[in-house]
Amino acid sequence: VKLIVAVIQPTKLDSVRTALAEMAVERLTVYDAEGYGRQRGQTATFRGIEYQTNLLRKVIVEIAVNDDFLEKTLSIIENVSRTGQEGNIGDGKILVLPIEQVVQIGGKEKGPSAV
């Protein structure tokens, strides 16, 4: 069992959720985040004054998947989250972490079947 942590553009969230649902990946956690990578923020203008924003808005999507779904899920997130044909700086990152144990709180399932 693996935990996929995808940091993506907020505008891509609905497309990612729809594409994952079509593949029967429907259990996920989403939360808002702010951060920066190589681009180190961006310049914005407010009421005629230019200022530097250090943190950019992102969305983090967490999905626990069984090993059989890992590559398919990664491929969908990567392809749907990309802006432009080749992608751009700021499109996000996908991290894959091992999960040692899964316990379903509302039931009695443990391990891969609890995912």
Could you say what each language-model-derived stretch is?
Residues 1-115:
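Positively charged, small/polar-rich N-terminal and surface patches that mediate targeting and assembly
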